[in-house]
């Protein structure tokens, strides 16, 4: 599923991401835009053999099990396929675990490069939340 901007913002808010670990909703919507273009079915293979899955491009080396990533830790205890669902609950729950680690949202390269230090509120402007 490809979410609309405000549709995704509303879903993320409902699932408790607004100000989760101090990151406003705009940060999460911005990250999703530049990680997956709001597409829950996005997958991208990495040079180390791992794959990033779903709307927040969660990595199989650490966070989920896809059965083909050597030494996968599966710290979210989920199959990576769960991260491709049109229902973003699994992605959000895993993202909460990721952002609670030492690096915060810097765990997402796209957030670091495209969202951090910008006017992320623009990503939810005009949305009825």
Swiss-Prot record:
Q: Name the cystine pairs.
A: 6-127, 30-115, 64-80, 76-94
Q: Which residues form the active site?
A: 35, 52
Q: What class of enzyme is it?
A: hydrolase
**GO CC: one term?**
extracellular region
Origin superkingdom = Eukaryota
Q: What else is known?
A: Lysozyme C is capable of both hydrolysis and transglycosylation; it also shows a slight esterase activity. It acts rapidly on both peptide-substituted and unsubstituted peptidoglycan, and slowly on chitin oligosaccharides.
Tell me what this protein is called.
Lysozyme C
Which species is this record about? Tragopan temminckii
